[in-house]
Regions:
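Catalytic phosphate/metal-binding cores of nucleic-acid and nucleotide-processing enzymes, i.e., regions
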Residues: 1-92
Length: 92
């Protein structure tokens, strides 16, 4: 199962879409062990963003069992921060 977090973009074929931080965390909790790929946007048009999802993934060790975490954001600073967090705390 693959999930795609973005508040604006169309959901690519093969992905399940979520539009907000809260929806994403709820979906992750409901499907633990079933998700292989997560594609994250940074800017979600709300207080919490894709970086907050990355922090949740790290804090809950949700990366175990994931094949890929993809950052598809157009925000270069957000992308850099998300990648640094994941590179530092998630096993390769």
């Amino acid at each position: 199962m693959k999930i795609f977090l973005d508040d604006i973009r169309s959901i690519p074929r093969g992905f399940e879409g979520v539009r907000s931080y809260n929806d994403c965390i709820r979906y992750l909790n409901q499907n633990k062990g079933k998700i292989t790929d997560i594609s994250l946007d940074h800017d979600l048009g709300e207080i919490r963003n894709g970086y907050d999802v990355c922090k949740w993934i790290v804090e809950n060790e949700y990366y175990e069992g994931l094949e890929r975490i993809i950052i598809h954001s157009a925000n270069p600073v957000g992308v850099k921060n998300m990648l640094q967090l994941l590179d530092r705390y998630c096993p390769k």
